UniProtKB/Swiss-Prot annotation:
The lineage of its organism: Eukaryota, Metazoa, Chordata, Craniata, Vertebrata. Heterotetramer of two alpha chains and two beta chains. Red blood cells. The gene is HBA. This is Hemoglobin subunit alpha. It comes from Vipera aspis. GO terms for molecular function: haptoglobin binding; heme binding; metal ion binding; organic acid binding; oxygen binding; oxygen carrier activity; peroxidase activity.
Length: 141
C-alpha cells in the first residue's frame, strides 16, 4: 500500500513530468530486450534496434500508461483495467514481464534522474510499479 508520502514522491518523479520523455520508455524497452531477450517474442513485427521508430512509439505508450496510472493512483484497478484486459486476453503477455519491465524502468529513471532519485524516491516508485504490475497481472487469474 502506498502511503501519502509515497504517492507524492511518485507524482513528482513519474507523473505527467515533461522531463520524463518517451525516450525513457524506448530506453527501458531496449534495456529489457538486452537483459531478457525472450521478451522480444512479443514484438516480431518491430525493429528492435536501439532508438528505432517502433521502440520510440511503444516506449511513449509505456510512459503514457504510467502517466495514466499516476493520475489514477487512488483507483489503480479501474485506471488500468483496459490495459490489463489487452495484455492478458488479446496479447497474452507473460505476466512475469511486467516486473521485468518495472525493473528496467527503475534502472532508466535512476540513471537519468540521479541524484534526485534517491533511496526514498526509489522505494516509492518501486512500490508504485509493483502495484501497477499486480493490477496488470490480476486479469490472468
Amino acid at each position: 500500500v502506498l502511503s501519502e508520502d509515497d504517492k507524492n514522491r511518485v507524482r513528482t518523479s513519474v507523473g505527467k513530468n515533461p522531463e520524463l520523455p518517451g525516450e525513457y520508455g524506448s530506453e527501458t524497452l531496449t534495456r529489457m530486450f538486452a537483459a531478457h531477450p525472450t521478451t522480444k517474442t512479443y514484438f516480431p513485427h518491430f525493429d528492435l534496434s536501439s532508438g528505432s521508430p517502433n521502440l520510440k512509439a511503444h516506449g511513449k505508450k509505456v510512459i503514457d500508461a504510467l502517466d495514466n496510472a499516476v493520475e489514477g493512483l487512488d483507483d489503480a484497478v479501474a485506471t488500468l483495467s483496459k490495459l490489463s484486459d489487452l495484455h492478458a486476453q488479446k496479447l497474452r503477455v507473460d505476466p512475469a514481464n511486467f516486473k521485468i519491465l518495472s525493473q528496467c524502468l527503475l534502472s532508466t529513471l535512476a540513471n537519468h534522474r540521479n541524484p534526485e532519485f534517491g533511496p526514498a524516491v526509489l522505494a516509492s516508485v518501486d512500490k508504485f510499479l509493483c502495484n501497477v504490475s499486480e493490477v496488470l497481472e490480476s486479469k490472468y487469474r
